[in-house]
Amino acid sequence: MLLLSDAYASEVESVFSKKPKSSWVLESENAYVLEDKYPQAPIHLLVVSKEIIQTVNHAPSALLGEMLELAKKAAQKYNIDKSGFRIVINTNKEGGQGVYHLHIHVLGGRQMQWPPG
């Protein structure tokens, strides 16, 4: 697992830490769910790792499983589990990753299109 330098970690941490813990809609031992500040769908949630991990490439399998379970629970909580939703993990520059702190996008509430990119 690769953690970021202290300077970069502080910069990244501020992106997700500006929201108070009371704004977390769900939580597990190692991750939490927030509503996205810049939604790309009627429902756009972020499942964020509590530990600052740069990309999915550096994440332990157990954490990824826990985060996907939390994404599934978030979809149920927001009633998009039956109509359908999309899960996205942007990884590195060409994958569209803008914040280098592991997070999963959960998007729903409308018909998704393909191809997505």
Q: Which residues make up each language-model segment?
A:
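HIT superfamily nucleotide-processing domains
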Residues: M1-G117
